[in-house]
Amino acid sequence: MIFIDRINRILDDRIDMKFWGVRGTLPVSGDKSLKYGGNTSCMTLEFPREQFFIFDCGSGIKNLGDSLVAQKRKDIHGKIFISHPHWDHINAIPFFSPLYMQGNDFEVLGANQSDITMREMVSAQMDGVYFPITFSQFAARVYFHDL
């Protein structure tokens, strides 16, 4: 019985890592992108007990969101780390469907830039001018912390 308990513990402590996008600057499509994919930066680490980390919000985060919805995941509690606020690392935040689902909560962490906070950088791209849906329409709870 002890051996089975040890095996179960090892399996329970598994970390899942997935790359949803690895490109820089612009997403691409076509034969040249088949090997590594065409989406811009997004990677996830999922730990036991539903700890969920997202690194960057390039175009790959759209597929991540679609996958979470297809799995019927609810009450997602995640941390989103933004490595730096270049467009290819934040431009797909408005397309991450779990942000529009009540019961989810996300903490967004990243470095401020001069006098601009991470919250200001993210919400600026969703001010109604650049994107038709505003930041206030997220149904999930979203918290920001500048590092």
Cite the ranges covered by each PLM segment.
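Binuclear metal-dependent hydrolase catalytic cores
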Residues: M1-L147
